[in-house]
Amino acid sequence: MIYRYIFWDNDGVLVDTERYYLQASREALARVNIELSNEQFAEISLAAGRSIFDIAVASGIPEQSIAELKEWRYRRYAELLEQEEIALDGAADVLKKLHGRLGMAVVTSSQKHHFEIIHRRTGFLDYFDFCLTREDYTRSKPSAEPYLLALKQCGCAAENVLVIEDSPRGLKAAKAAGLACWVIPGHHTSAQDFAEADRVLCGIREVMQLIL
C-alpha cells in the first residue's frame, strides 16, 4: 500500500504527556478522597475513551463539584506541561525526514490550550498541514468523527491514509473511519488489545523505516 498522508495522534505518540494527564487526574480525584490507579486510568481513559470523572459520578459526588474538579484538572495539567521538554525520543527526527515526502496532520483529543503549550517548544507544528484538537469536533475518539473530519480536510482517498496511534480508543476511531492504523503501545497501553491494528510497532522510528 502506498500511503500519501499520515494522521498522527499526539499524546503518547509524539509527546510524553499521558503521565502528566494521569497525575493531574489523580490529584483532582484525591481532592474528593477518590484514588485513581494506573489500571483504571488505562481502561477508562485510554481504552474506553470515557471521562475518569465517571468514577466521581459513581461515588455520588455532586455535579457542581465534578465541574469544579474538571476545571481544577485543566489548570493543573497546564502547569505540569510547562515543566520540562516532553517530545518523545525519535519524534523530531522522524517528522523532519518524512516532511515533504508525504502530507502529515495531527488528530488529537487534547484541548487546544494544552496542545499549544505542548508544542510551544517542540517545533513540530511546522511539519503538519493542519492539526485537529478537541474543540474541532463533537464526538471524541473512539468515535470515527475526528478522523473522518481529517480525511475530508486532507483530500486524500482513505486507502492512501495511515494513522499512527498508541491507544485502543484511537485504534477504534481509525478503524471506524476506514483507515489503516499502526499502533505504538506506550507505558499505559502496552497490555491492551491491539488485534485490529495493521501493525504494532516498537517505536516511532519504525514508522520511518517502513514508509521510506
Where are these regions (language model features)?
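Asp-based, Mg2+/Mn2+-dependent phosphohydrolase catalytic module
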Residues: M1-R4, L102, Q111-L212
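N-terminal helical cap/lid subdomain that shapes the substrate entry/recognition surface
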Residues: I2-D93, G100
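Residues at secondary-structure transition points
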Residues: D16, E43, A47, Q64, ...
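Generic structural signal for conserved hydrophobic packing positions in ordered secondary structure
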Residues: S25, F53-A56, R73, T108, ...
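Acidic/proline-rich low-complexity IDRs
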Residues: E35, E68, K97, G178, ...
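Short amphipathic alpha-helical segments and helix-helix/interface helices
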Residues: A92-L95, L171
